[in-house]
Structures are given as C-alpha cells and as structure tokens.
Design a protein with these regions (language model features):
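Conserved SAM-binding loop
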Residues: 262-263
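Class I S-adenosyl-L-methionine-dependent methyltransferase module
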Residues: 133, 138-146, 267-295
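Core catalytic lobe of class I
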Residues: 1-242, 246-255, 259, 294-295
Length: 295
C-alpha cells in the first residue's frame, strides 16, 4: 500500500482512532476496537485467536460470527485472513466460514506439549495455520533450495484427477515450491517467553512475506505479546495490534501487562535495526506514526 492511500486512511474523520492504532498496539475489546478501522483498509490478517483449550481465564473463544462481520468489512476483498489453530478450534474455525476456507498449513514445532497426558495420549507437536480469502490474495511462495533435475517431457493427459493438461517439460534449476508442512522452532528458541501461547517471530515473518507486500497493513487483533507485530515491522509492513490485556498471568503466578511488553519488544526491534533499514522504514512512513519509535 502506498503512502497516499495510507494518508487517506489516516485522515478519515469517520475513524478518528485509526491514526493512533496504526503501527501501535491498542488495548481494548477486539470487536469494539476493530470497529475503529476503516473499510477495506487491511491487507492481511495474521492472528493467534484464543483456542479455548487451556485453563487460562483469557482463553475463551471470541464469537466467530462477529469476528467475520468485522473482517469482511475491514479486509480488502483480495486480502488473506490467516489463523493459527489447534484441535477442536481448527474445526470450529473451518466450519464458521466454509465458503472462504481454502487450505491449511501444518506447523511442526520443535517442542511437544501435552506431557501431563503422555501415558494416555500422544504428545502434541504441531498446530494448524488456516488460510481464508474471498479472492486470490497476494501470494509469494517462499522457495527453498534443492537439487536441479530434468525429467524430460511429460506427455499430455486427458483423464487426470486434476484435469487435462498438455505436454510439459518437467525440470527444475534447484528451487522448490513450498509445501503445506512448515517447521519452525517454538518461541523459547528466540529468547524469553512472556506469554503462555507465544508464537515465534520467524513463523510470523514467513507468513507475512507469503501473503503481503512491503508497506501493506497487517492486523493482529489478539496480539498477545506482539510476536506477529514484531514480524510485520521486521518485514517492512505497517501493523495494527489489538490486545484486551485482561487476566494475564505468566505461568499462573505473575501478572503481566502485554501492552507494555509489546511496546518494549517493538522498541527493541527498532534499536536492533541497521541504519539502512531504519532509513527505508522512515522513507515509507512506517515509523512516523509511533511517537515512541521516534524518540
């Protein structure tokens, strides 16, 4: 999204809070705060909604029909809506909007969970990432390196399971298209864990690079400790974080303020950037709206 369109959104008098929300994390109820975002302004939703699978007070499923109403209003028609999920919540999320559900990734984690039930159930070592959209969104396949090959010409086929196709040369210079199974280390591999369900920044960066362009606006409307906001910043995207910031405790002992934690992580990310990156972010106006980042 170019600066002209960003400035038009910021000057929309119907949504006076939007300017303070852009490139910040805002405390409040997710549905109510999403009502402060202009129509058709979000390029990508990347969010780790509460699954309703833990005993944490905050881990209750947000009414999905109300969420979809807001997503449909604020997300561009060709914007992707990408959700982490697991277990029963995966099914609930799929069935809440089957017409727009397209596919899912399986995220293989470096560390398993469910140890308390290890003698009764298998350990859980993956989560799902569900992708929804109305029209084909931005998609940048994150290629990986492999061995080059040339298998010659594949003959035409008229009875295939996936439709007819003409003869085609089957070869590769070594780059491989991504598959729907991803491996990323869990959040503790990146440093201190400050949220019970904290996601790794690296996972967020991969998905943001896949489904958005530099300068786009990424929304995480239940942003927790801010991993996906940090990922958006590192990839040169504008971002909006919303966090209710209630009933938060670390390991059921110490109360935590996720707004302050997120702001601190964002500021630390800025401090660790090199001069060229900072110059680029200022050039595209990404940092100009956050006073804390301009001190």
């Amino acid at each position: 999204m170019d600066n002209t369109k960003i400035n038009m959104l910021l000057n929309n008098r119907k949504y006076p809070l939007f300017k303070s929300m852009l490139n910040n994390v805002t405390q409040g109820d997710t549905i109510e705060m999403m009502k402060q975002i202009p129509n058709n302004s979000i390029d990508l939703v990347l969010v780790d909604l509460p699954y309703g699978t833990t005993q944490n007070k905050w881990d209750s499923v947000i009414p999905l029909p109300e969420l979809w109403d807001q997503y449909h209003r604020i997300v561009k028609e060709n914007g992707a809506m990408v959700f982490t999920a697991s277990g029963l919540f995966t099914a609930q999320l799929m069935l809440s909007n089957p017409n727009e559900y397209k596919y899912k990734y399986t995220w293989i984690k470096s560390k398993a969970t469910n140890f308390l039930n290890a003698k009764k159930q298998p350990l859980r070592k993956h989560e799902d990432i569900l992708v929804f959209y109305r029209k084909q969104p931005t998609y940048h396949p994150q290629m990986t390196e492999g061995e080059a090959y040339n298998k010659g010409i594949r003959k035409n086929q008229v009875t295939g399971s996936y439709g007819d196709f003409n003869p085609v040369m089957v070869q590769s210079k070594g780059m491989r298209y991504p598959v729907d199974v991803l491996y990323f280390k869990t959040a503790e591999a990146e440093g201190k864990v400050v949220h019970p369900t904290q996601k790794p920044v690296a996972l967020g960066r991969y998905l943001i690079k896949t489904f958005s362009n530099p300068g786009d606006i990424v929304l995480d409307n239940t942003s927790g400790s801010g991993s996906f906001l940090v990922a958006a910043l590192q990839e040169g995207r504008n971002f909006i974080g919303i966090e209710k910031n209630e009933d938060g405790t670390l390991f059921k002992k110490k109360p935590v303020d996720y707004i302050k934690i997120t702001e601190s992580r964002i500021e630390q990310t800025i401090r660790e950037m090199d001069a060229n990156t900072l110059m680029h972010l200022h050039k595209i106006n990404l940092l100009s709206n956050n006073e804390a980042l301009n001190d």
